[in-house]
């Protein structure tokens, strides 16, 4: 385990101004508590005030643990500021964060690397359901904002009326919105810490949810998390390989989580990658880490230790 004196004064960056602020606040507090319990000189810093980040040098912070989700914190913006300030920080660098944040661009990178992804098309307020049917060759879609996380603004659409409601829910005319085919299958997620792919988790939403949406993630009591996922060894090996290749393809480093869906024919498709995964009581990376004997404190310290060699 790392020595507290090696780390100096640590800023836990949390909060921010994205749609995922509340989740970031919870995760940031959990990380801060774990660091303090380990004797590390850690301090919470809410970047909801955009000027606050610029005081890190003046306040003699040695490094930063980034627990910001969504735009402004997970898209490369805060990472660029930290690099300019010369402060080591957890997780991926600017380009990888920017790629991961934009689901459309990220999928193009994965596709160019030969990794399996679902077809997608961009959606605007003028989009028609019949056109999407022709473009994606199916009659059941997922509509989602390309630049949000935590399943914010995601809808399942089966007709024009539902499409008309889904577009403003995903952000409307100002947002970059995408449509993908609805796949009936098993949702798997793989955490990655220090180039180690953690055991798979299968996510099973309750019968009252069509899919693993924001409510199922953070509020529903009947969402199941099966860890390790009950899948056969060959499929698990294939999915682990895909997850790590997806992580590497965008130049990610440190830690992250890769989400995918496996269809009825056991074909995996990448959905998205999260480079600042949640660290709440519902969060998946801590759950998977426990399966290899890494408790929350050890996980947090392992992630922070990456800043000593970055």
UniProtKB/Swiss-Prot annotation:
Cofactor binding: number and manner: Binds 2 magnesium or manganese ions per subunit.
Subcellular location: Cytoplasm
Transmembrane regions: none
Residues that coordinate or bind Mg(2+) 1: 259, 272
Catalytic activity: 2 D-alanine + ATP = D-alanyl-D-alanine + ADP + phosphate + H(+)
Cofactor(s) the record lists: Mg(2+); Mn(2+)
GO molecular function: ATP binding; D-alanine-D-alanine ligase activity; metal ion binding
Main location group: cytoplasm
Key words, A-Z: ATP-binding, Cell shape, Cell wall biogenesis/degradation, Cytoplasm, Ligase, Magnesium, Manganese, Metal-binding, Nucleotide-binding, Peptidoglycan synthesis
Recorded GO CC terms: cytosol
Pathway(s) served: Cell wall biogenesis; peptidoglycan biosynthesis
SUPFAM superfamilies: Glutathione synthetase ATP-binding domain-like, PreATP-grasp domain
UniProt enzyme class: ligase
Family annotation (InterPro entries): ATP-grasp (IPR011761), ATP_grasp_subdomain_1 (IPR013815), D-Ala_lig_Van_CS (IPR000291), D_ala_D_ala (IPR005905), Dala_Dala_lig_C (IPR011095), Dala_Dala_lig_N (IPR011127), PreATP-grasp_dom_sf (IPR016185)
UniProt domain ATP-grasp: residue ranges: 107-305
EC number, UniProt record: 6.3.2.4
Record's function text: Cell wall formation.
Sequence similarity: Belongs to the D-alanine--D-alanine ligase family.
UniProt name for this protein: D-alanine--D-alanine ligase
Native organism: Dichelobacter nodosus (strain VCS1703A)
Taxonomic lineage of the native organism: Bacteria, Pseudomonadati, Pseudomonadota, Gammaproteobacteria, Cardiobacteriales
Gene: ddl
């Amino acid at each position: 385990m790392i020595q507290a004196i090696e780390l100096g004064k640590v800023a836990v960056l949390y909060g921010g101004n994205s749609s995922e602020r509340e989740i970031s606040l919870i995760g940031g507090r959990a990380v801060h508590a774990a660091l303090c319990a380990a004797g590390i000189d850690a301090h919470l810093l809410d970047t909801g005030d955009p000027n606050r980040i610029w005081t890190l040098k003046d306040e003699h912070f040695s490094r930063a643990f980034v627990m910001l989700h969504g735009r402004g914190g997970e898209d490369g913006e805060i990472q660029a500021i930290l690099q300019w300030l010369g402060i080591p920080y957890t997780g991926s660098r600017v380009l990888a964060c920017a790629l991961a944040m934009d689901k459309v661009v990220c999928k193009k990178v994965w596709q160019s690397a030969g990794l399996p992804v679902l077809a997608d098309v961009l959606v605007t307020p003028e989009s028609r359901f019949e056109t999407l049917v022709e473009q994606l060759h199916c009659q059941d879609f997922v509509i989602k904002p390309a630049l949000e996380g935590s399943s914010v603004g995601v809808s399942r659409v089966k007709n024009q009326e539902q499409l008309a409601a889904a577009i403003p829910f995903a952000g409307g005319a100002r947002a970059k919105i995408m449509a993908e085919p609805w796949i009936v299958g098993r949702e798997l997620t793989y955490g990655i810490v220090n180039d180690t792919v953690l055991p798979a988790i299968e996510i099973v939403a309750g019968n009252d949810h069509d899919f693993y949406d924001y409510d199922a993630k953070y509020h529903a009591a009947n969402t199941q998390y099966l860890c390790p996922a009950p899948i056969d060894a060959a499929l698990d090996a294939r999915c682990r390989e895909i997850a790590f290749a997806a992580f590497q393809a965008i130049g990610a480093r440190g830690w992250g989580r890769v989400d995918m869906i496996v269809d009825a024919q056991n074909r995996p498709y990448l959905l998205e990658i999260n480079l600042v995964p949640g660290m709440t009581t519902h969060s998946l990376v801590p759950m998977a880490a426990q399966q290899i004997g890494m408790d929350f404190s050890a996980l947090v310290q392992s992630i922070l230790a990456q800043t000593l060699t970055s």
